[in-house]
Amino acid sequence: MGWNLLFFKNAPFKPDLTQNAEWNRGAYLVEGLEHCAACHTAKNLIGGDTSAYLQGSNLSEWYAPEITSNKVTGIGSWTPEQIVQYLKLGSNHVAVASGPMAEAVTNSTQYLTDADLHAIAVYLKSQPGSDRRKPLALPADDPQMKMGANLYEVNCTACHSSDGTGIPHLAASLANNPAIIGPDASS
């Protein structure tokens, strides 16, 4: 009851008249029916959304990544078609849905029309991203890098290839993947 009083908005969707119909349809779906912020927006101490809208959030032992225009930790470098493919099939050449996101695809987004999925893509790509940047690389001769290279070669190259580009529709590309570069790669 208290959470509803503080955070629940019992009001109809109001379109942004400065945006086109497709953007507003995307906003309606993201903010309402698909409720993306429930997982992808960090919460405050009493469970309300923080101002970091769609900029990623920890959910128990899962991390829901940033889904904004940030080109490093978000989906800003994805094309609208890659977003549509991800939401429809659960994978594209950049990422593979797993955990709660796989459930969202299986139970919800795969059933949306291509037009609705494209509207979601347009809306998400318009959202301001966090100020997170790509972390600084360690020197190649650093012991941690050598150990990581060995672990990758032994455990990852069969599916993700030696250059990290993956196999389309089977193993996601790890190169420049926001889920890997983001603040929490546990998912």
Give the role of each language-model region.
Residues 43-81, 100-113, 166-187:
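Gly/Gly-Pro-rich "capping" loops immediately C-terminal to redox-active cysteine motifs
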Residues 2-5, 14, 18-44, 49-56, ...:
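Sequence/structural segment immediately N-terminal to covalent heme-attachment motifs in c-type
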Residues 30, 94, 170:
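Short, electropositive, low-hydrophobicity segments enriched in small/polar residues
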Residues 24-27, 84, 118, 175:
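Generic structural signal for individual residues within well-ordered alpha-helical segments
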Residues 1-20, 62, 81-146:
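Post-cleavage N-terminal segment of exported redox proteins
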